Amino acid sequence: MKITFRIQYRTVWGESLCVLLSQNHIQHTVEMTTRNGEEWTGKAEFDFHPSEPICYRYAVSRQGTLVRQEFGAIPHSFYPGNLQQQHYLVEDCWRDLPQDAYRYTSAFNNAYTPEQPSRLSDNTGRCITFRELCPGLSSHGQRLGLIGSCAALGSWEYCRPLRMKEVQPNVWHLTLDASSLEYPFEYKFVAIHEETGAVEKWETRPNRIFPLQPLQRGETYLPMETEVFFDDAPQRIAGCAIPVFSLRSEGSCGVGDFGDLKLLADWADETGQKAIQILPINDTTMSGTWTDSYPYNSISIYAFHPMYIDLRQLPALKDKKAAEAFEKARIEVNSLPMMDYEKANKLKMDYLRKVYQMEGKKVLASEDFLHFFRHNEEWLQPYAAFCYLRDSYGTPDFNRWPKYSTYDADEIARLCTPGNKAYTKIAFYYYLQYQLHVQLLAVSTYARAKGILLKGDIPIGISRSSVEAWVEPHYFHLNGQAGAPPDAFSVNGQNWGFPTYNWEVMEKDNYRWWRRRFSKMAEYFTAYRIDHILGFFRIWEIPDHSVHGLLGQFSPSLPLSMDEIRSFGLNLDRDFMTQPFINDKVLEEVFDAQSEYVRQHFITPNGKGGYALLPEFDTQRKVEAYFNGKEDEDSLKLKEGLYSLISNVLFVTDHHDAEKLHPRIAVQNDSVFQQLNWKQQGAFNHLYNHYYYQRHNEFWYQEAMKKLPVLTQSTPMLVCGEDLGMVPECVPWVMRQLQILSLEIQRMPKQMYEDFGHPENYPFLSVCTIGTHDMSTFRGWWEEDPALTERFYHQEMHHQGEIPVHAPGWLCKDIVFHHLKSPSLLCILAWQDWMSINEQLRNPDIEGERINIPAHPRHYWRWRMHLTLEQLLKEKELNQTIRELIEDSNRR
């Protein structure tokens, strides 16, 4: 079989095009030639399997290295047919993403059934194969058809269109006998009823014209793939955001579970919501205490937390007394207003161990489990071994394990061998993950059947005490700490403690680590949120001797030399720039009555009229260690004060090149900045703004474009980015180019110098919400800053008179409707904000509804809904109100 590829693509000197072609996992590269640097031709001759599609992408190379390739989730494709002697003439144009890429994602396609393309008989000599992209038809009981001016195309009779086959999701093919057509002919694509075949919609463009295409016997011509558009209003949907642990049902066990998630899907369906967004559900079990409640610090990027198993779907305990005792304890822990992480997890794990003793061997021998194990063994076995060793040694910190501290695949395989004395305990974790897989997959299938988008959350970081850090340490910089610079959430920045990624190593295998992670998630979810998408451009890297985030620097970055700093008019002594500035005035401002105590115990005169920290207190980690266990008010004040002295510097030294510097983030708020005269302050601010808002834009754009196209197109899920905080100008460039949905929050406007965003102006490719899990609810925010609330009430809501002290239901309803009316593709509101519209049902404890406070690094994540899901499903008035709000905003 021969294939001739033709494409127009303008190259520059030294570049060439090739075709990256595959069938049945067999890869081929076809080099292309050109006479003018614009019209390219490539020829291939292979034996191909007739029933499998040939998929291919175009790529640009320079000196043998690929420098660009098509990155869309939908490659070009065609089916070769039955004749191995056929010659395929393929016309193409370069394509990265379809115009409305979101419509091609699994979030908006729930009804695809693969079809084999139509095939002509073996004695047919000349063929034309149309290949079109058109999303969403199957979900509406339609398929793509072709109708045209000649008799073979129905002579424009609306009841005689030719039916096309959906060979891949949203990809439609039709092969015709070229000799049956009258050239030139006009034609259009139409949406036809699945059963009757009647035309229901015509594409919105002038008639297409097919010119005379002389073909030799044995040739099949494939014109360019095109996108087919119909005059449809964009599908905007509404949804609810809530952590799984926050769900409450009559039968749950002190914490929400996957069975409750199915009930939430029922409520979403009842109210007309088509999206459910949750927080990360990965296993975070480290100490077994409430500190494990933080869902972004998991021990595995694949394994789910055992607390999410719905015990109701498992066998009942055979021991009657044990069953009665469990039920009594379950009712008690489930009646608590907040999650008691320790009680709920201990109760559930005790039950799970008993059930494992009852049915573990049977389940582990089942064909379904063995299938699950074969497909997940790569991560499941190390995870189960990690859990066993964590339990055995009493710590998840593998560096402290007396044995197996360095991962060895062969040793771990021997440890996990059936018959080994540890196997029963290790296999317990296989059993748990299998049950979690079965239950979440059932929820996913259930939600899809109702047309509900299930949106997961991918944390940016991994724990340094995790399976991944143990098994694949080469992918990480374990001596660094990831975090975020100061923002509305935290004036000192955030130090998450996660190691940073070794992107150079990850790039070598085309980011396999990330692609595996996304692929696993796609088994259950149709959309996902990339937590801190800015981390794919650059990450805020904090030295391991720091507690706060103020002494961090972006990585990768372009640090400044001393000559560059001087070029901005800033001629200062390097020690003054990089050493903590401490004098008597600073001490009085920071410590007040404790100043003399600080002079005597923590600092020493530096001979320049100021002070230097003693070596035993010259880093924040040393100070933290000194004050460990001292929780009295004076000690806490001293500790925070010493932290602030240590970060009172104008510049921080680059982690890789000690000769280069970074301006310290937000230093204008600190006393060292006040030591500069007005001219020096102006020069510093000029340098600061250039460094943080201009210098890196192109550099960080290129960094993101190395990673994000590969990752976001590796699965069919809808991609949403959490683009809050200190957002460089290049971030929206990339997100628009890759059609990644942005996050829009009215009280965190993207426009500088504005107090509030304007939902009516949000971009279509965005997720609109009132607040995130890191923020107070709308009712909570309403009471935080009366002056700001007053401006919002008068200027944004256009109300007159005195503002209500507490946000009444009618006002909350207005806010909800205002957000629903936004142009955003998704409007996903926190469950608490949905409930705020009903004064009889909403929680009277406003502050208790907050999920997280980012400024508190040891926050207890424990909020649970105050109503049961069964109650919620019975609240007809509330549910009807929500449905009407959604319908009136033209969401569906």
Segments predicted by a language model, with ranges:
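Terminal, intrinsically disordered low-complexity segments enriched in charged/polar
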Residues: 93-99
